[in-house]
Amino acid sequence: MLFDKYGRSLQKLRYVVNDECNYNCVFCHFEGQSRRQGRYLTAEDYGFVTSVFKSLGVADFKITGGEPLLRGDIDLIVANIAKTGAYVTLTTNGYLLRKWVRKLQAAGLKRANVSIHTTDPEKYSKITGVPPSAFREVLRGLTEARDVGISLKLNAVVLRGINTDRDSVKNLVKLAASLGAALQFIELMPSGWGASVFNELYEPIETLVNIIFELGGRPAGVRKELHNRPLYNIAGVTVELIKNFSNPTFCSGCTTMRLTSDGKLKTCIYADSSVDLMPYIKSRDVEGLLYAVRTALARREPRFKLYSSS
C-alpha cells in the first residue's frame, strides 16, 4: 500500500468515465474536471488500470461521471474492473438504472450510489433540471436494483430550504429503509456550478445532526478509512454525514484519488493539477504507470489543513 507525505494511504480510485449527463443539477461539481474531455478510456483500459492499482493495494473502485450509464459500454467497463477481483461500485442519477441494472449485476457491480436528494418530485425537478416524472423512473430503477441483489446507497446533497427540514430528512430515511439502502448526506461544494449557488444554498452538515437525533437516531461510529465520516443509525438505516467543505478532518481521512475520463490522475477534487496517465495506459506500460502514480501521490496535498505555512 502507498502513502502520501501526510501518512494518508491510497485505498480507493474513482473512475470518471464520461462528462456527458442527462441532468442539469444546480450544484454539479463535474467531479473536478472540465467538460468535453475528448477521447475516453476504453473498457479494456479500465481493466488494465485496475490491475495496476490493485498491485499497489487499491481494492475499491468507483465509477462515476457525468452520468456513467450514458456510456454504451458501461457493463463492459464494470466487467473489466470486476474480473480483476476488485470491489466495483457506481454513482448514478438513476434515470437509466432500470435499463442497465441486470447487465450491471451480471457484470459484477456490487453497489449503486443513487443521487436522489429529496422524495418530493417537484423539488427533485427544481434540483436536477428534469421533469418531475423522472423521479418515478428513478424509483423504479432503485426497486429493480434491490430485487436483483445490488446493494444501494442513496445520496442527498444538503441544500438550504430544500431538504434540510425534519420531514425531508424523515422521508429520505423512510425511502432508504424501504429499499434496504444506506443514506448519505453530502455538504454542498463550492466547485463547478456549486460555486454560483453556494452562498444561497449552503447549509452546514451539523444542521442535520439535531434532526437525526429528533428522529431517534444514534451515533454508530466513524468511517476512518473514508474521510472520517460520522455514522448514525435511524431505525436500522445507516446514515453517513459527509462534511467536505473547510474540514481538515475530512481531508486527513481522504484515501481517494480520481482518474478523469481522458486519463488524468487528480489527487484532489479541488486541485487543478493532474498527472497524465494516458500514454502509459494506451501503451500498457506498467512501470511507467507505476512511476506516474507515485509522482502524483508525492504531490498530494489536503485542501483543508489545521495549520498552514501560507
Curated annotation (Swiss-Prot):
Class in the EC hierarchy, top level: lyase
Pfam families the UniProt entry points to: Mob_synth_C, Radical_SAM
Cofactors, names only: [4Fe-4S] cluster
SUPFAM superfamilies: Radical SAM enzymes
Pathway it works in: Cofactor biosynthesis; molybdopterin biosynthesis
Residues that coordinate or bind S-adenosyl-L-methionine: G66, S115
Annotated EC: 4.1.99.22
Binding site for [4Fe-4S] cluster 1: C21, C25, C28
Residue sites binding [4Fe-4S] cluster 2 per the record: C251, C254, C268
GO molecular function, one term: S-adenosyl-L-methionine binding
Location of the Radical SAM core domain: 5-218
Cofactor: how and how many bound: Binds 2 [4Fe-4S] clusters. Binds 1 [4Fe-4S] cluster coordinated with 3 cysteines and an exchangeable S-adenosyl-L-methionine and 1 [4Fe-4S] cluster coordinated with 3 cysteines and the GTP-derived substrate.
Any Gene Ontology biological process: Mo-molybdopterin cofactor biosynthetic process
Record has Iron as a keyword: yes
Key word Ligase present: no
Record-linked HAMAP family: MoaA_A (MF_01225_A)
The family this protein is said to belong to: Belongs to the radical SAM superfamily. MoaA family.
Record's function text: Catalyzes the cyclization of GTP to (8S)-3',8-cyclo-7,8-dihydroguanosine 5'-triphosphate.
Name of this protein: Probable GTP 3',8-cyclase
Species name: Pyrobaculum aerophilum (strain ATCC 51768 / DSM 7523 / JCM 9630 / CIP 104966 / NBRC 100827 / IM2)
Gene field: moaA
